[in-house]
Amino acid sequence: MIKKLSLYTFALLGTLVLFNSCKKEYESVETLDTRSIKEYLAKNNIPENMDPSGFYYQIINPGTGAAVANTDSVYYTYDFKHADGTSITKNGDYTIPGTFLGYTDRFSFLTIPAVRITLGKLKKGGAARVILPSRMAFGKNGLTALGVESNEIIVIDLTLPLFNNQVEVDNFLINKFITANSLQVTTDPTRVRYIISAEGTGKTDLKETSKVNVKYTGRFLNGTTFDSSTDGVTFTLNELIPGWYKVMPGKIGTGGKIRLIIPSDLGYGQSSQTDGMGTVTIPGNSCLDFDIEIVSITN
């Protein structure tokens, strides 16, 4: 009986030791997070505002537009950073995501409620910063692919721009692109911007229903090429995206060269384009930049 009791006692003590060690490990991570965050706040003169869920935040600009709820469609920007300010990942320079506020916490690598909660504290036009404890971010494993270390706190800069629809977003991004690249463009009534470098011959021959042989390069606004043909390929013009067939007729002829900067609704719209393997080649709501040369026209 004594032997059995001793074995039981030792087993119980072992369980308690294991439980306490786990508890201490958790508490040590929490303590480490708190110390790292307080050091960051002090260094950057940021007040200690802690959300009840455990993350810290700073309202940089509360915004002057409408308040937002989880069921509202919003446009937002994000920049995940190390505590030293180095960017980890962010929305692209020429990408502004839009979705329901309730879905803004969903990223390909993690779901982060702190993003949704903090955006919900803003009005449109606002900006905020989230200081995320490691246990609410990438934890003790970190994320090697993004260069995040074990138990590293993460800073997330957020904005809630004053855009009401995709047309406003596209106009903003295209104007930003034009300014950044010092382009001299003409704006078509369709909102497509264009630059004609060579008119070619017989520009009145080019109609929406024409068969055209073209050489072209298609890029995103960040300069990445998504499609091209240097040998020439034949299409019926009105079977292509509206940004081509609504703009090109009457502007260039055979041998003509034009650059088109196309809003997303005159490109592929909200739908992502995929290749034969299902890989996204053109994300939805992408503005596009084309260089086009007309090799021949057939009516």
Where on the chain are the PLM-derived regions?
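C-terminal motif of bacterial Sec signal peptides marking the signal peptidase cleavage site
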Residues: 17-21
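Cross-family detector of peptidyl-prolyl cis-trans isomerase
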Residues: 2, 6, 22-299
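Sec-dependent N-terminal signal peptides
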Residues: 5-16
